[in-house]
């Protein structure tokens, strides 16, 4: 099965400038941070992405209806940010590297069609230190994002970033997007709501900065 995009609804309002992705990972930090944008704003499900392993990760509704796990793409507006954003959420990460690439490419193709300019992926940053205070790290794809991130107090990170967060951010540069990957410090507690809230807040500030630039 190839990756497949199911269009649910078209966008009738202002086109989004920024796309955000959050999938399950360390401390569930990324998905919960991205979910805050959807739950706290006015969100509309516009598309669903299916990959091969969607059929083996099933969801059963309260009425007993079984359906494959899809990756949902939301169009979100809010008084908290200047322009609408696109948010990708999913209930799992494929353990197959090829499928992870397919998901990333499909999402980025969709973002390209919608003329998105910035793509930010979210995740957790494993730390063993006592977390009296938390840092949020960024690996930016462009100079503008780097400059704005430093102003927002984000720390620069280096090294290997695994999973969907690293893959989507890494590929997005080759699709011509600005942005990068943001990672909040966590000790791996599930869920780490403190890390997710901090990550959400830092990205919100950054989104408003890039929207105004």
Description of each model-found segment:
Residues 1-91:
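N-terminal short beta-loop-beta anion/metal-coordinating cradle
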Residues 23-29, 94-95, 124-129, 188-190:
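Gly/Ser/Thr-rich loops at beta-strand to alpha-helix junctions
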Residues 29, 99-103, 164:
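Short, glycine/acidic-rich beta->alpha junctions
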Residues 34-39, 104-106, 197-200:
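Short, solvent-exposed amphipathic alpha-helical segments in soluble enzyme
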Residues 86-88, 118-120, 178-183:
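Hydrophobic/aromatic beta-strand patches that form the interior of the parallel beta-sheet core
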Residues 95-143:
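Internal, conserved structured core segments that host functional sites
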Residues 108-119, 173-178, 205-211:
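Secondary-structure boundary elements
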Residues 127-206:
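Catalytic cores of processing enzymes, dominated by hydrolases/peptidases
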């Amino acid at each position: 099965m190839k990756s497949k995009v199911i269009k649910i609804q078209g966008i009738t309002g202002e086109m989004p400038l920024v796309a955000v992705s959050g999938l399950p990972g360390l401390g569930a930090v990324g998905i919960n941070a991205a979910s805050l944008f959807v739950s706290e704003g006015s969100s509309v499900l516009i598309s669903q992405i299916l990959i091969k392993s969607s059929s083996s990760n099933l969801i059963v509704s309260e009425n007993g209806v079984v359906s494959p796990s899809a990756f949902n793409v939301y169009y979100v507006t809010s008084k908290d940010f200047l322009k609408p954003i696109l948010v990708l959420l999913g209930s799992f990460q494929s353990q197959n590297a090829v499928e992870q690439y397919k998901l990333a490419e499909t999402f980025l193709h969709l973002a390209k069609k919608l003329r998105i300019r910035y793509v930010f992926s979210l995740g957790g940053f494993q730390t063993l230190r006592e977390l009296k205070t938390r840092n949020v790290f960024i690996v930016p794809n462009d100079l503008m994002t780097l400059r704005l991130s430093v102003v927002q107090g984000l720390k620069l990170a280096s090294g290997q970033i695994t999973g969907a967060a690293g893959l989507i951010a890494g590929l997005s540069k080759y699709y011509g997007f600005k942005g990068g990957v943001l990672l909040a410090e966590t000790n791996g507690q599930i869920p780490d709501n403190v890390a997710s809230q901090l990550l959400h807040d830092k990205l919100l500030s950054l989104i408003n900065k890039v929207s105004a630039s």
